[in-house]
Structures are given as structure tokens and as C-alpha cells.
């Protein structure tokens, strides 16, 4: 009888362990290991949900200015510290109003249910605060492109991202360290 119970339980335990491993791998694939922010895959599902439910939503793309120089001058650990600081600042800024993600490298993304000019100014200020690292004050700067979903005739995430991306490059073209709305 005990052998029969064991024979029944062993495969079930195997499936439970396998399911747990898969769940962990899926969660890891949706979170950036350095910053803890959502990856593109994890962020996209949340962003699509947000823009469907909130017509006043906004999408922002953030690209660090002169990140390669910081990384090359102060080392990869300083670069990682800068990425973590930016992620923390962006996460704090989004708060319960939205979701932040890291697309890769030094590029970040956020979606918020609504955003005012004052909100965008607050983010700009936060992202431009220097980073205290190893007894040094390292300058941080970012170019931010923003798109209000309501500005587009059809609020598809791909179109909102494209508009925010164009706005971000416009901000970079204007000497960096700034924001640019998509309109």
C-alpha cells in the first residue's frame, strides 16, 4: 500500500517542482536582474492594459545621456550603480500611477495613467540629480520623450512608443538633458 502511495506521489512532486522552476524562470524573464524593473515583455502587457483602460495615459522613453562615457571613465560598477539609481528614481516617480521597465542598455520606459507638465518636470529633476558613488558625485542626465495616448487617433502601444521614441530623439537633438513631448 505504501509503495502504491509513493508511486502516486513521486510524479506529482516532480510536476510541482517542475512547475515551480518554470514559474521562477518566467518571472525572471519578465524582470531585469540588475534593476528589478520589468523587461520589455513584462512591461508591454502592463502598458497595453493601462492604455486600454486610461485614455489619459502617457508613455515615456528615457535614455541616459553620455552613459558610455560614465561607464568607460568610472568603470562598469559605476555604470551599474547609475542604471540602478535611474531605475529606482523612475520606479518611485511612477509609484502607484504606472509601471516602469528597462528596455536594455541605458534605455528605460514608463507608462502612467495620467501625467501633467509638473509630473514630467519632477521626473526630469529626479533623473538629473547626481549619483553619489564611491565618494564621488557623478553627473547623471537623461533625454525623455513623452507621448500622451490621447494625442493619437488610434491608441496602439506600438504607435505610442514610436511617438515617444521620436520625441526622445528630438530631446537628444536639442543638446540632451531634457524632455520633449510628442506633439
Region spans (language model):
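Signal-transducing coiled-coil linker helices
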Residues: 1-33, 40-50, 56
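Conserved nucleotide-binding and Mg2+-coordinating catalytic segments in signaling enzymes
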Residues: 27-45, 62-75, 84
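Nucleotide second-messenger and two-component phosphorelay signaling modules
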Residues: 29, 48-58, 62, 73, ...
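Heptad-repeat coiled-coil signal-transmission/dimerization helices
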Residues: 43, 47, 82-83, 87-90, ...
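A short glycine-centered flexible hinge/capping loop motif at secondary-structure junctions
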Residues: 71-79, 104-105
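Short, conserved catalytic or interaction motifs in soluble domains
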Residues: 72, 113, 173
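GGDEF/GGEEF active-site signature
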Residues: 87-150
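Catalytic-core segments of nucleotide cyclases and related cyclic-nucleotide turnover enzymes
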Residues: 121-124, 147-183
Amino acid at each position: 500500500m505504501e509503495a502504491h502511495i509513493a508511486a502516486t506521489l513521486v510524479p506529482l512532486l516532480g510536476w510541482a517542482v517542475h512547475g515551480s522552476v518554470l514559474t521562477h524562470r518566467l518571472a525572471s524573464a519578465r524582470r531585469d536582474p540588475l534593476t528589478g524593473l520589468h523587461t520589455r515583455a513584462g512591461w508591454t502587457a502592463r502598458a497595453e492594459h493601462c492604455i486600454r483602460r486610461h485614455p489619459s495615459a502617457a508613455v515615456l522613453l528615457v535614455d541616459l545621456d553620455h552613459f558610455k562615457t560614465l561607464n568607460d571613465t568610472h568603470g562598469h560598477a559605476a555604470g551599474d550603480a547609475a542604471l540602478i539609481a535611474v531605475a529606482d528614481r523612475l520606479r518611485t516617480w511612477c509609484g502607484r500611477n504606472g509601471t516602469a521597465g528597462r528596455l536594455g542598455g541605458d534605455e528605460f520606459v514608463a507608462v502612467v495613467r495620467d501625467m501633467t507638465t509638473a509630473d514630467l518636470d519632477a521626473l526630469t529633476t529626479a533623473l538629473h540629480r547626481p549619483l553619489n558613488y564611491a565618494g564621488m558625485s557623478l553627473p547623471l542626465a537623461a533625454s525623455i520623450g513623452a507621448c500622451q495616448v490621447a494625442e493619437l487617433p488610434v491608441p496602439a502601444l506600438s504607435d505610442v512608443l514610436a511617438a515617444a521614441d521620436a520625441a526622445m530623439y528630438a530631446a537628444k537633438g536639442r543638446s540632451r538633458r531634457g524632455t520633449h513631448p510628442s506633439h
